[in-house]
């Protein structure tokens, strides 16, 4: 009897990762975890869009937020200031063309001033 319970418990534990929450891209970008929310990075025609999403997959209001994208472009580091653009998006213009999947870090500063970082590899 104990063996059956042990086997059943092991099967349940091994199945747990299947229930893990994986954030989904709603704007065609890449989504990573950053502090208490998810960050989606979208690069379009020299513009960086950063969408903030809560753990319920709902867009977050970005009023009072600011950000900085530090991206590696053509082997050089480029800093792009991000400002609110719409209700749930921060946006900034790059100095030139961007790859569709830029690599780097996005730093988000909420109104409380506690900076969080999202790494995009």
Predicted segments with their positions:
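Bacterial Sec-dependent N-terminal signal peptides
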Residues: 2-4
